[in-house]
Amino acid sequence: MHKFRIPLKPVSFNQAYRRARKGMMISEKGMKFKEDCSDFLREQYTEEKPLKGKLRVRILYQFRDFREKVDIDNQFKLLLDSMKNIVFDDDSQIYKLSGEKQIGMNRNEIH
């Protein structure tokens, strides 16, 4: 089992992508989050190659502010995209995905 800690406030799908002529495009905010996540993952993932085969992924989102109105289902896409080619080859390898959110924590983090 691999565990990662990303000390960033998650960016939702709605913040990360915007409509364009040819469909959806990643926003500047989304691109910055994805790059920062990828950097943290590269630091923590010590294997030479991405994982192969079927994967189970559990994600814990921690938020500081009680006033946060967070739809957990909007949080997965950008994070999983940032893991691609670092932790696994493609998110199609994930056969079980679970997530949890905690609000009122000491810091904004993703585990």
Language model features with spans:
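Acidic, proline/glycine-enriched N-terminal capping motif
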Residues: 1-111
